[in-house]
């Protein structure tokens, strides 16, 4: 991979990460067209994607650092120091639990299907294209049928698990992590801005 190719892929990642259109899918499409993906060693491309996404993760931490710091400090204070009963905890502390619960499905499924995720199937252009179309249709359906009632403090344990399962679905090539989680959030009744914020 040349420096110019790396820059192009970085631009693709930056343009697609914060939209519900699968940055991984678009990176893989670009990698395929540029001849950078080996069918013999597809796991090398998976590793590259993991590394390139560290940059966008850092930008998310910078943008949401006040929110994340509030969640972290209140979670630690109310669960480790003061041991406050869950029902009496602050919204930020409860969000800490929701984030943990919402992360469990993708960790478990990711470990169980590690070989398939790193394999050739997730680099297949037909799989990626089909996934992009399917997600677009489902997201459009969610926008039309959603109730848009719930605020951030209304998110329940079940809601966070369902959103976590939606996130795990994004392990399929072409399905956007933010797209699936936002769609899941809309289907359970979250307001669109709340679904987007909780997704990131």
Functional labels for PLM-detected ranges:
Residues 1-200:
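Multi-pass membrane proteins that catalyze or facilitate reactions on polyprenyl-/lipid-phosphate substrates
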């Amino acid at each position: 991979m040349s420096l110019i190719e790396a820059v192009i892929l970085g631009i693709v990642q930056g343009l697609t990460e914060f939209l519900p259109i699968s940055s991984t899918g678009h990176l893989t499409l670009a990698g395929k067209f540029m001849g950078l993906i080996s069918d013999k060693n597809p796991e090398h491309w998976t590793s590259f994607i993991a590394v390139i996404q560290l940059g966008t993760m850092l930008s998310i931490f910078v943008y949401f650092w006040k929110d994340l710091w509030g969640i972290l400090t209140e979670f630690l204070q109310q669960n480790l120091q003061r041991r406050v009963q869950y029902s009496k905890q602050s919204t930020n502390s409860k969000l800490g639990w929701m984030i943990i619960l919402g992360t469990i499905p993708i960790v478990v499924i990711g470990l169980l299907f590690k070989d398939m995720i790193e394999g050739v199937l997730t680099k297949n252009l037909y799989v990626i294209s089909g996934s992009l179309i399917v997600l677009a249709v489902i997201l459009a359906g969610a926008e039309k049928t959603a109730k848009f009632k719930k605020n951030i403090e209304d998110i329940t344990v079940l809601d966070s698990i369902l959103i976590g399962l939606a996130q795990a679905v994004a392990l399929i090539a072409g399905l956007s992590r933010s797209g699936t989680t936002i769609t899941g959030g809309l289907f359970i009744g979250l307001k669109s801005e709340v679904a987007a914020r909780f997704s990131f």
